């Protein structure tokens, strides 16, 4: 409706704006009356009362065409515009005069319209109620063009639909953004991972750069030494050419000074290496002391835990007594519910127990598989050790030229390491074989346990049938004793489990300490090896410099001797050296050679001492590795004991629950024995004869192999038994489980 009103207002404004200049009436504006047609000319028009123009000369009045406007109430494909048909001029209708709007009385318009510039006369005899006359020279052809001059056509319904569509578009974009959020998060995570990888690569490159820097420094030192040696050799050659003697030669002196400086640097480095070795040994001793203190503290903690366990035993016994009293009170209330669900619960519990045992066996098999994998890892390590051995052999072959005496010791060390690795491999193989045998034994034990459980179930059902006749009181005492015994065994199992846990924690701590010690020793070994390599390189450089010096001396001697002979033969001014001077010079040369040899022997002895220290450190490392292997074995044993103790505890708890349910049933049977009718007893006898009271074994979802006839025979045989034999059977039905549990635990401890 609002759109229709607006269109009509715009049309009125247009019709008001296109008047002619010859009109003497004042300007008018349409309010809400669009077109008024009076077919009867005699009808009185109240709007023409104030008109003063003569009747004979009617004014020029524009005949307004009839406009057909069709608004689409239902929305089309393009709902933004209304379909307005072009104005078609229909047959002529009587002329009409339209009064001016009320606004014209208050705000009269100017002579010229501000919008279109059409002149209008304001002179009218009755200014109080002016009449507007519309007159145009050419009529407009289409309403759409006219309306477009005033801002176009609008549809508020279409506008609302546009806003709704925009909102929908915004919601869809939001949903798309929310869907794309996890992808962007993944991309961000991938970028972070790439960042971390880049940082790791940077760290690795930094380490490589540092290593290369160290190698560069070493190469620069060697290059400087080589340059010094070459310069000294050149100087000596120049002196020899000039004819300078050995005593007055500067090159020989500088060579001796350089050799002394190098010897001093080598000795200082050897001292620093010794000091570091002493520091490492002192730290190792301190760590051993701390280890002993930790072991003492662990022993003290174990003693305290045992004392606490003893106190807990007394409290647990008191708790068991109180629980028995409470259960005796609650049995009367829970009789009906236990009778309803006893059979189903027994079956489900048996199935659950067997599944649990199977899971335990599977866990043992998985553990053994893990041990086999660990053995494979040890094999791989042994292969790497063999490769390292091969590398060491190659290094030894290269080092034979330098030190032949130390070859035998290093070979013996390598052979000892190889033998120890072979022994470890044999031990691992033996452990694997033991684990396989343990798996086989566990499977056999599982089968025997299944058969024994079936037998025990049959015995339990037979005892239930017998106890319903009147032997519940005597069996209650025996069951109470058995309950106390089982409670004690449960406490023992809990103690053993806690002891195993404590041992496992202590062994883990010791393992961690041993690993730290081994890492520290490895670091010290690496530093010592690097320094030994540097010392060897310096020794080689010193030997090369000595060789160069000896070669230079020999060349000088040869040149001097040749020059002397030539001078003696050719020139009369030749210098002849006496035999004493010659002997003195030869003695000096021999002394210098002996000094160089003594220095070399000292350096070699220092290297041997460093090698001995290295062998000692290697022995310590081997001892630490052995201790670690022992600790690992102890850890495995402790974990196995803890698992077995947990399993035994669960089995004993299940037996206790069974016994409690049986005890409650017995008491209810005792209370209801006098109330039994002969018909009920007869029906029970029939059920027994038909085999309804037959025992069933629900292990692995299979029924017992006994048929109806055998069930009847067993019931007849059981009725003939005495109360003493019944007590013994009850005890035998419960004790084999305890015996099997203890035997399993002992076998595991022997392993």
From Swiss-Prot:
- Region annotation (Disordered) maps to 455-479, 625-751
Q: Name one Pfam family in it.
A: WEMBL
User: Which residue windows are coiled coil?
Assistant: 165-558, 588-647
Q: Basic and acidic residues compositional bias: what residue ranges?
A: 455-467, 625-689
Modification Phosphoserine occurs at = 113
| UniProt keyword list | Coiled coil, Phosphoprotein
Q: Where is the composition biased (Low complexity)?
A: 704-723
Q: Does the keyword Phosphoprotein apply?
A: yes
* Keyword Phosphoprotein applies: yes
Record InterPro entries: Web
User: Could you tell me which PANTHER family the record lists for this protein?
Assistant: HEAVY CHAIN, PUTATIVE, EXPRESSED-RELATED-RELATED (PTHR32054), PROTEIN WEAK CHLOROPLAST MOVEMENT UNDER BLUE LIGHT-LIKE 3 (PTHR32054:SF30)
Q: Which family does it belong to?
A: Belongs to the WEB family.
* Protein name stated in the entry: Protein WEAK CHLOROPLAST MOVEMENT UNDER BLUE LIGHT-like 3
Q: Which organism is it from?
A: Arabidopsis thaliana (Mouse-ear cress)
């Amino acid at each position: 409706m609002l759109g229709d009103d607006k269109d009509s207002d715009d049309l009125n404004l247009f019709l008001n704006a296109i008047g002619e200049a010859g009109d003497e009436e004042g300007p008018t504006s349409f309010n809400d009356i669009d077109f008024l047609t009076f077919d009867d000319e005699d009808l009185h028009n109240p709007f023409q009362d104030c008109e003063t123009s003569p009747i004979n000369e009617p004014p020029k009045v524009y005949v307004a065409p009839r406009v057909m406007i069709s608004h689409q109430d239902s929305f089309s494909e393009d709902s933004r515009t209304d379909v307005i048909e072009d104005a078609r001029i229909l047959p002529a209708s009587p002329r009409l005069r339209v009064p001016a709007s009320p606004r014209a009385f208050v705000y009269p318009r100017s002579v010229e319209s501000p919008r279109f510039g059409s002149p209008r006369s304001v002179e009218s005899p009755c200014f109080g109620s002016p009449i507007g006359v519309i007159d145009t020279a050419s009529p407009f052809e289409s309403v759409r063009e006219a309306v477009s001059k005033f801002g176009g056509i609008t549809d508020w319904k279409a506008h609302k639909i546009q806003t709704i569509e925009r909102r929908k578009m915004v919601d869809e974009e939001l949903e798309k953004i929310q869907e794309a959020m996890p992808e962007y998060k993944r991309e961000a995570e991938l970028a972070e991972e790439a960042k971390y990888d880049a940082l790791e690569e940077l760290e690795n490159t930094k380490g490589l750069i540092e290593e290369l820097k160290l190698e560069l420094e070493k190469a620069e030192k060697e290059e400087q030494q080589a340059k010094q040696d070459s310069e000294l050799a050149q100087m000596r050659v120049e002196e020899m050419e000039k004819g300078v003697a050995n005593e007055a030669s500067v090159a020989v002196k500088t060579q001796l000074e350089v050799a002394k400086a190098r010897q001093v640097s080598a000795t200082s480095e050897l001292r620093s290496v010794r000091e570091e070795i002493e520091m490492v040994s002192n730290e190792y001793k301190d760590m051993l002391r701390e280890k002993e203190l930790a072991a003492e503290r662990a022993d003290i903690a174990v003693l305290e835990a045992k004392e606490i366990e003893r106190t807990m035993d007394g409290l647990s016994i008191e708790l068991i007594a109180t629980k028995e009293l409470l259960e005796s009170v609650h049995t009367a209330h829970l009789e009906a519910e236990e009778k309803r669900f006893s059979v189903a619960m027994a079956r489900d519990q048996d199935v659950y127990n067997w599944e649990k045992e199977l899971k335990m066996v599977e866990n043992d098999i998985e553990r053994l598989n893990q041990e086999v994998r660990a053995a494979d890892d040890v094999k791989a390590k042994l292969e790497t050790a063999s490769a390292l051995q091969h590398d060491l052999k190659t290094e030894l072959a290269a080092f034979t030229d330098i030190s032949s005496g130390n070859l035998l010791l290093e070979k013996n060390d390598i052979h000892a390491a190889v033998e120890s690795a072979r022994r470890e491999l044999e031990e691992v193989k033996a452990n694997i074989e033991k684990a396989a045998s343990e798996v086989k034994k566990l499977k056999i034990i599982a089968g025997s346990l299944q058969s024994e459980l079936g037998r025990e179930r049959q015995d339990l059902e037979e005892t239930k049938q017998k106890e319903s006749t009147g032997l519940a009181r005597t069996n209650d005492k025996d069951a109470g004793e058995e309950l106390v015994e089982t409670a004690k065994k449960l406490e023992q199992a809990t103690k053993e489990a806690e002891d195993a846990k404590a041992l496992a924690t202590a062994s883990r701590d010791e393992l961690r300490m041993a690993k730290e010690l081994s890492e520290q020793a490895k670091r010290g070994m690496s530093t010592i090896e690097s320094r030994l390599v540097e010392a060897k390189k310096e020794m080689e450089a010193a030997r090369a410099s000595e060789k160069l010096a000896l070669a230079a001396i020999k060349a000088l001697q040869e040149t001097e001797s040749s020059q002397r002979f030539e001078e003696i033969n050719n020139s009369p001014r030749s210098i002849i050296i006496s035999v004493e001077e010659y002997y003195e010079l030869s003695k000096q040369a021999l002394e210098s050679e002996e000094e160089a040899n003594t220095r070399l022997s000292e350096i070699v002895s220092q290297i041997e001492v460093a090698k001995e220290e290295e062998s000692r450190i290697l022995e310590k490392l081997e001892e630490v590795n052995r201790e670690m292997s022992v600790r690992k074995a102890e850890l495995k044993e402790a974990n196995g004991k803890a698992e077995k103790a947990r399993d035994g505890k669960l089995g004993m708890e299940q037996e206790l629950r069974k016994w409690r349910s049986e005890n409650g049933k017995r008491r209810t049977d005792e209370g209801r024995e006098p109330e039994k009718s002969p018909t009920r007893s007869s029906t029970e006898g029939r059920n027994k004869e038909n085999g309804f009271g037959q025992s069933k074994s629900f292990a692995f979802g299979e029924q017992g192999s006994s048929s109806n006839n055998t069930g009847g025979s067993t019931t007849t045989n059981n009725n003939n038994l005495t109360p003493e034999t019944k007590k013994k059977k009850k005890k035998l039905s419960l004790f084999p489980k305890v015996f099997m549990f203890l035997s399993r635990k002992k076998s595991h401890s022997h392993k």
